[in-house]
Regions:
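N-terminal export and membrane-targeting signals
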Residues: 1-18
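Active-site cleft segment of glycoside hydrolase catalytic domains centered on the general acid/base Glu
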Residues: 194-215
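Active-site-adjacent pocket scaffolds in enzyme catalytic domains
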Residues: 63-72, 150-166, 231-347, 398-409
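C-terminal region of N-terminal signal peptides and the immediate post-cleavage residues
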Residues: 3-4, 24-49
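Active-site beta->alpha N-cap acidic-glycine motif
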Residues: 69-185, 192-196, 216-218, 222-258, ...
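C-terminal domain-boundary segment and adjacent tail
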Residues: 78-81, 132, 267-280, 334-418
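Ser/Thr-rich, Proline-interspersed low-complexity disordered segments
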Residues: 41-64
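Hydrophobic membrane-insertion alpha-helices, especially the h-region
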Residues: 14-28
Length: 418
């Protein structure tokens, strides 16, 4: 189980990340002036039913804005205009070489004593990259208020991960705001991180709706829940901005998708074990799965996430033999790069790399991701984007062109039209 370490950091155990063993391993054999400020809405209690979901979030083309900052509800969130730094969307012609999209995403999005959220904001900023940070809702809930969380099929206040310290909540709020201003996406990793028995894979559509409603509420009401009255509001309206998420342990996508329709979400990143092919929609929502990548030195493939490399290297321990760290670091980095090169020189299908903010095996998985960002994001034709930005681009394309791209094998070389 997860716990609080001696330095007060929130720890995520292997058990909290892992799903069933068959999913965990997931290795298969295969080849100007200051704006005016107004207040909108009344303060809502975190225990009341949240307001009705917003309509479908609009794609990136910026809506008009009157320059006024609107503080929402109890002051936890605000509308500060269209998100800065969003890329222009261009429509492909038939046969035209598409960009090579790469999406780096992070499950949890907590700034704790390891300062990994701020580290990867900096990595993104310095390498022309945008990323998706999936916030776990209870990371904005103090431990003293844990019973505000009413998890499906569990007692109030129960969670499979630790609640944060007050200091970590304040640091996380800062990181969320700055990440959004820099053009990154804030998605959701839901709340309690329950897996397997009584986890998301066993939840009904209504139970998923409850989990989603609470994820919204924890963002909309953190000032009321924490008492951090002097902390500025988040610079976005989560009701309009939230476009998708990733379920803990990649469980329960079928009922999650049925629930997500009510919220106008654009994508879901909760499926697993698919080859590197151009995305399709499930139930009207873009499906962005973790992918199978060539494992270095083996005739097998591995899911594109830190945990799955760990499972192949040190099994069920996050503190393996330090003498093997350099080899494991190279394996992980080369695995991601193998997947990149296969599609960059082939079908140009988007590459999805998922991770947690963790220090497993001496931090080698964080270093591997940083190395890959620095290696690929400035290469010709590469766009390191968020999931929402990718959904914007896909929605702007001719469906016939996308269908042609889906017929390509990942490594299939093509003579693209200029």
């Amino acid at each position: 189980m997860a716990g609080i370490g001696r330095t007060g950091r929130v720890r995520l155990s292997v058990g909290a990340v892992a799903a069933a063993v068959t999913v965990v391993l997931a290795v298969t054999t295969a080849g100007g002036g200051r704006p005016a400020v107004t207040t909108v809405g009344a303060t809502a209690s975190a225990t009341t039913t949240p307001p009705a979901p917003a309509p479908t979030p609009t794609p990136s083309p910026s809506p008009s804005w009157d320059g006024q900052v609107r503080v929402i509800g109890d002051g936890s969130t605000s509308y500060t205009g269209p998100q800065p730094g969003q890329p222009a969307v261009e429509k492909l012609a038939p046969g035209q070489k598409p960009p090579q999209f790469v999406v780096f995403s992070w499950d949890g999005a907590l700034e704790n004593d390891d300062h990994l959220f701020s580290r990867f904001r900096k990595v993104a900023r310095e390498n022309n990259a945008d990323m998706t940070f999936f916030l776990t809702g209870i990371y904005l809930v103090p431990k003293s208020k844990r019973t505000l969380y009413r998890p499906p099929q569990h007692a109030p206040g129960e969670a499979a991960i630790s609640f944060p310290t007050d200091g970590h909540i304040e640091e996380t709020l800062h990181e969320l705001g700055e990440a959004w201003r820099e053009g990154n996406e804030i998605g959701t990793h839901f709340n309690g991180h329950f897996c397997e028995a009584k986890g998301g894979g066993q939840w009904s559509v209504e139970e998923w709706r409850s989990e989603i409603d609470q994820a919204y509420s924890f963002v909309e009401n953190w000032k009321t829940n924490t008492g951090l009255a002097s902390v500025p509001p988040l610079p976005f309206d989560v009701r309009k901005d939230l476009a998708g998420g990733r379920a803990p342990c990649l469980e329960g996508q079928k009922n999650l998708l049925a629930a997500a329709k009510n919220y106008g979400w654009r994508y879901d990143a909760s499926s697993t074990g698919e080859f590197q092919v151009w995305p399709v929609k499930k139930e009207g929502i873009w499906n962005f799965p973790l992918q199978l990548l060539p494992y270095p030195g083996r005739s097998t493939q591995v899911l594109s996430m830190d945990f799955n490399f760990l499972a192949n290297q040190s099994g069920d321990t996050t503190e393996g033999d330090p003498r093997k760290y350099p080899t494991w670091l190279k394996e992980t980095r080369d695995g991601y790069l193998n997947g990149f090169e296969r599609v960059y020189n082939g079908s140009r299908a988007p590459l999805f790399i998922g991770n947690h903010f963790e220090t497993w095996n001496g931090g080698i998985y964080m270093q591997a991701v940083e190395d890959v960002v620095k290696s690929v994001c400035r290469r010709e034709g590469v766009r390191c984007v968020s999931f929402r930005q990718l959904a914007d681009w896909l929605d702007a394309q001719d469906p016939k062109v996308l269908e042609q791209l889906r017929q390509l094998d990942p490594a299939q070389p093509l003579d693209w039209a200029k």
